[in-house]
Amino acid sequence: MEGGSEKTTPEGCGGESKSKRKMKTAAQLEVLENTYSAEPYPSEAIRADLSVKLNLSDRQLQMWFCHRRLKERKSTTPSKRQRKELVTPTAMESWEPPVNAGDLVAGNELDSRRAARGSGGSGVTVVRRFNEPSSAEVRAIGYVEAQLGERLRDNGPVLGMEFDPLPPGAFGMPIEMPSHRKATRQAFETNIYVRSDVKPIKDHVRPIREYQFIPELPSSRTDHSERVSPSHHFGVPLDGSVMRVSAVSAGHRDDYKISPQIPNLNLATHQGKPGHVYSPNLVEYDSPYQKSYMDTAAQVHDDPFVKSEREVGNEDEDDDALQLERHRKNEEARIAREVEAHEKRIRRELEKQDMLRRKREEQIRKEMERQDRERRKEEERLLREKQREEERYLKEQMRELQRREKFLKKETIRAEKMRQKEEMRKEKEVARLKAANERAIARKIAKESMELIEDERLELMEVAALTKGLPSMLALDFETLQNLDEYRDKQAIFPPTSVKLKKPFAVKPWNGSDENVANLLMVWRFLITFADVLGLWPFTLDEFAQAFHDYDPRLMGEIHIVLLKTIIKDIEGVVRTLSTGVGANQNVAANPGGGHPHVVEGAYAWGFDIRSWRKNLNVFTWPEILRQLALSAGLGPQLKKMNIRTVSVHDDNEANNSENVIFNLRKGVAAENAFAKMQERGLSNPRRSRHRLTPGTVKFAAFHVLSLEGEKGLNILEVAEKIQKSGLRDLTTSRTPEASVAAALSRDTKLFERVAPSTYCVRASYRKDAGDAETIFAEARERIRAFKSGITDVEDVDDAERDEDSESDVGEDPEVDVNLKKEDPNPLKVENLIGVEPLLENGKLDTVPMKTELGLPLTPSLPEEMKDEKRDDTLADQSLEDAVANGEDSACFDESKLGEQWVQGLVEGDYSNLSSEERLNALVALIGIATEGNTIRIALEERLEVASALKKQMWGEVQLDKRWKEESLIRANYLSYPTAKPGLNIATPASGNQESSSADVTPISSQDPVSLPQIDVNNVIAGPSLQLQENVPGVENLQYQQQQGYTADRERLRAQLKAYVGYKAEELYVYRSLPLGQDRRRNRYWRFSASASRNDPGCGRIFVELQDGRWRLIDSEEAFDYLVKSLDVRGVRESHLHFMLLKIEASFKEALRRNVAANPGVCSISSSLDSDTAEISTTFKIELGDSNAVERCSVLQRFHSFEKWMWDNMLHPSALSAFKYGAKQSSPLFRICRICAELHFVGDICCPSCGQMHAGPDVGELCFAEQVAQLGDNLRRGDTGFILRSSILSPLRIRLLKVQLALVEASLPPEGLEAFWTENLRKSWGMKLLSSSSHEDLYQVLTTLEAALKRDFLSSNFETTSELLGLQEGALASDLTCGVNVLPWIPKTAGGVALRLFDFDSSIVYTPDQNNDPLKDKESEDFVGLETNILRNLHEKDVMETPVQVAAYKQEENWTDPGLGGVSSSGRGGRPPRGRGRPRARGNGKKPAVSVKPPRGAANSNGETMLRPRAQPRGGRKNGRRSGTKGRKRPTQGTLGICNEVGGGRRVKEVAVTAKTSLPDNDDDWIETPELQDDDGEASSSGRSFQYEDYDDDDVMAPIDDFDGGGESSKLVGRGEFSLHSDDEYEEEEEEEEDMNMKMDVNVVDDEDEDYINEDSYGRKQHGISISNDAATRKRFNKFEDPDLTSSSSSDFQ
């Protein structure tokens, strides 16, 4: 139906066709129709798209849509619909529209007739207009909208119009109408009702009417009502018909009304509306006939939609219909005219709008054109300007080019002229230079013949002359001299092969590593150099090397203690200066970095208390303090950068910064973090074997993977891949899984074997069948799960049970067979006094312990290779891997940075378990830290200052007698050998009585054509006046000398003299390393001796540091002579080296002979020698204790000396606070045996250990502290029998810890004990103490005792175990019988337990007045300041001296050498030596060269100390040769210090080491447990005591390495020096040191009969070291007398 309308749209849309109008194509119409069906009123955007798509104007589109809408409206009229029905009757046959309910209500007979005609005629039903809604629909819609209060939505649900008939009685229906209802129903059922398809009407979206101004069209109804299709179902119309039928039958025909049952559905209201479908003209057809007809029809048909057959025959109604049709046609014609008029108006309006739009577009277009014209004009203008600019630039450039060309032409001409002039000048200059060079060569040759030449150049000149066949290098031409580098490949080896260089040591670790040898020598030199600063006794290199191989060396303990004290003192000094603002030394304040801030920060990070280090540093605790210091300094495992704040129990708003971090340190770590954090460090686990396999680790996974691979093994990448595939370890969390695997495989050589580079396999005994791989992996995964869940406590016994699964611990001895089974849980072990297992050469355990003559078992320290293999990275293997097994980030320190191995060794065991190399590395690291502190730095600066001043003074004295010296030397040089010939070598035999005579000999190499005189300045520069040289060696070409005069000799003599002056000054005040000299290859020659005496074994050795870092030794006279002969004295370096070698020749050879006589055999190197035994020196006798009985006896004696030292220090009353303040209990629990020093209960009648009866009443009346003090007094009186008797009972440190614990328990105040600490519990505790055999057991005992003391009786700064572990108070004491919880991070070592014990003891409040003790360290102050004892100036403060010191001053004839630490005859402890007698006088009866007046501090007749008057200013030469020594001040006795005089004043530097008299009251923490003592009077820490006699100034040859304080430990290796200046600075000339006024004294002393016997600590006689007493060298070391160790006290430590 729409299709026809669409085709006629172009013609009928406008009513009239225009002549220019074009028809639209089919495609355009199709698009327009589709658009119209979707949107009858298209928007501008849609029209624009259509305009582009269809090529139509917007006006054409508007007109088309307007006509299309009008056509749509026209298609709804009845005439058009009738025409359509007539045209297509067949199309409407099947459509039977319903009868309009409104027609029935209004009585419209026209509809009835049309319906009748349609049914009886052609069969085509008469329908309503297309989209005209019925009256019933309109009323229903209005009714619903009235109820809803709003209009219906277009897209809402369909409104129902057909309903079932009402039941009888409902809404006014009669109850009985059976006949009518039945007839109606039957009539309805007989009529075939075909409902029309309403879907097209429903789906049709009727647009909003455009022409609403036409009154005939329904314009008042909204889009909702228009779009609702009429309903043909039973509904409201049916109900209304029924009601009307009822009203007609009741006689109400005249007044038709709507039934009151439907009050809101007022149909009459819709009839009068303009938009209603019924016209008002239809009222005329409402007649009584019609009403009666409808009543009859209603009675016959209850349903109004049922057609009546009588309607067909009503002809009258046809006429009405025709009339109505005509009327409608008229109306439509009128409407069409109006529409056409309206369209014309719209067309005109659109044309007007189009005209306006075109005008606007034209204006816009003109504006845009105008802007375009302006823009083009501007662009053209800019282009013209740019072109003009370019033209101008090109013109300028052209002018510039022309100008340059002109200038270049001029310059070229000028340059050509200049070149010609220059060529002429050069020709003249070349000629002039040639002549000048010839003259210069002549002068240089003449000068080189008189002066020293650079050694390497000299050698190259000799090689060149020899190659060219010239008789002398003087004949070399200028070209050859300029190209000497061409002859470098022809240089010979130097030192020559005739100089036999040997390896210095024959045992490990020295024979395999030159780095270790270098570290050993440099460490020893540092300690000897700063012995006065550190407070050390001098010791030889032999003793030092032997200490590395002893099990428990006393020397190592003393060295570590003084170094730790120095470091802590540096920290304390800086902190005190920063806190108070005033420092005792301004250097400290100026250099806060000297206080080791990195150590302080590290200690804070680890939770260590530096105050505890200072208070508790002693012979027992130093290994643990060393471990904590190493961790703090970053030498151990590195802490991860984690935001962890450790909150201490007593942390009160502490701030962590570089200045006050020391003050804010609190002991321990935070209670809530301590346990978990330290468990991650692995410190809570006991020491485990390095070969154990922890489930979940990389090592565990690698072992199971490789056990299936056989002997070929896998490389690292394959192992990592298979581990990942097996699921035993997740390597994806690691950034470097291959590195982790490689580290795990390379560390354990017992389980894994390297078969190729980066390829490993397991040992044969651990390999498995590859067919069982799944089973093995399943078991391994199960073990990992069990381990993580805590089911399996993987201990050693567990591994022993799984030996068949290759997870057992293998022996840690590298020589033990790996197939050794562990079925025997208790293999035979030899426990001896040293605590190690003896091993035979085959590596097996020796079941029979070695016995000494005393019947005591003896085993020396383990060999180096065993120690190196025995203790490896257990901490890294175990703790870190355990932490990684629980997550990569769980570990608190970095797995890739494990630190030094010796730090881990101190965690796992005591210091005695470290290997020699680890001990050396520990010392190197400790010295590296110490050199960064202010103590060493200040000492270096002051020594540099003093040495510089002394050099100027010494050179000034030489200058005062310059004229006399020149005359004397020239006379001696030219009159001694009047008959000497050129090239003749003159050598005078060395005198056997005087070293000076031998030093006068100057052997000259036969290859030297011109020999230079060597001046012995030994007797020239050492005194205030110079003496005439008696024998001046040296041979010169006298004819040449006569020609050149005396100038060369004078200059050469002056240079050598000045160099020697500087050398001697730096030797007295060492601030840098000074070797003997260097050769042409810059190999350096060293002499490491503690003194210049011939009795020092070091005097008989010369170490050679080769250029490549190797160390060799010259220990034979032949090698020495060959070396001296091979030196070319014309060279600068070798001339000085030759001079120094000649100076030490006599002492070297004599000491060498003594060494050979004292050690006729070789050292015990049976299993450690290299293949080339001829190159190994035998001068070092290192006793390992496994070669013969003598060595075993020596080892045993040294160990007894160490035990005595330990007992003496630990039994001292100042060792524990319990000694001073402890309460005397009425019922002591223990007593200590006087025979064997073992503990036993008071009730025991005899000692269970030795069987000694204790019936004496005196012992029973003494408290336990008095018994310990009595034992210490016996020890200091010389009764050391209990030490020997108790050595075999239990280890030394275990016994000492037991005594200390018992003493603390016996001194606890009774009121301070908890209520649960009953007598039975106390006895049980004592039984556990006596039965303890390990440090772990003793730590349990200590923790139990700590829990028994009330918190009020402990210092507030002390954190108990309960507080640190976060336990409730008293939780530790809940079940003491089953063990207590201990701090897991404290190592189970003697040092760790002892440090905790001393810390606990110092925190106990024994007495109420304890805090009032002035000697008690005040806890309220952080680091109570100590007086700086380093190089104190005595101008303002004089130190009181003890009677022993005064007596020492009177021993003028045997006064000690200040250069060796000055140990007097009173020995180490301040008392006369035992078994030595009075010091012997000189054998030849000669008196000492220097007479010393009574010292300033000597005692008067009343015993009072007097102050010696100051030395008078020294004059010139008026006092003669000895005038300078008469006024010289003797060094202050009793201190290790440095004394010197500058000009006319006095300058005294003193170091008070541990003297109480020089310490303030608050410093007794440093001296409460002095370690540097020996009541037998031993001189050295290893037992040697020294007596020193007078020695020549010539022999003071102990140059010490220099330390600049800022270096690291690595700088000790090889050629790395610790110097404030360069290595070769001593070679430089200082011309400004010409005008000083000090004279030097030369003392010629005969020390041929210098012979005395030293006695070491264990009674063996050794040669001492004799040293002269010349004034020039009395500045090295002063005699050390510790007031604490002198006889003025009641005991050594009181």
Curated annotation (Swiss-Prot):
Pfam families: DDT, HARE-HTH, Homeodomain, WHIM1, WSD. It comes from the Eukaryota. Coiled coil: none annotated. Highly expressed in growing tissues such as inflorescence and flower meristems, young leaves and floral organs. Expressed in roots, rosette and cauline leaves, stems, flowers, inflorescences and siliques. Residues 1471-1485, 1515-1531 have a biased composition (Basic residues). It comes from Arabidopsis thaliana. GO terms for biological process: flower development; negative regulation of DNA-templated transcription; regulation of transcription by RNA polymerase II; vegetative to reproductive phase transition of meristem. The gene is RLT2. Disruption phenotype: No visible phenotype under normal growth conditions, but the double mutant plants rlt-1 and rlt2-1 are small and display early flowering. Transcriptional regulator required for the maintenance of the plant vegetative phase. In association with CHR11 or CHR17 may prevent the early activation of the vegetative-to-reproductive transition by regulating key genes that contribute to flower timing, such as FT, SEP1, SEP3, AGL8/FUL, SOC1 and FLC. Involved in the transcriptional regulation of seed-specific gene expression. Interacts with CHR11. Interacts (via the DDT domain) with CHR11 (via C-terminus). Residues 696-765 form the HTH HARE-type domain. Residues 1-24, 795-822, 1450-1541, 1555-1639, 1655-1674 are annotated as: Disordered. SUPFAM superfamilies: Homeodomain-like. Residues 795-816, 1561-1578, 1589-1605, 1624-1635 have a biased composition (Acidic residues). Residues 1459-1470 have a biased composition (Gly residues). One of its GO terms (cellular component) is ISWI-type complex. The modification Phosphoserine is found at S806, S808. GO terms for molecular function: DNA-binding transcription factor activity; transcription cis-regulatory region binding. Its main location: nucleus. This is Homeobox-DDT domain protein RLT2. Keywords: DNA-binding, Flowering, Homeobox, Nucleus, Phosphoprotein, Transcription, Transcription regulation. The keyword Ribosomal protein does not apply. It is found in: Nucleus.
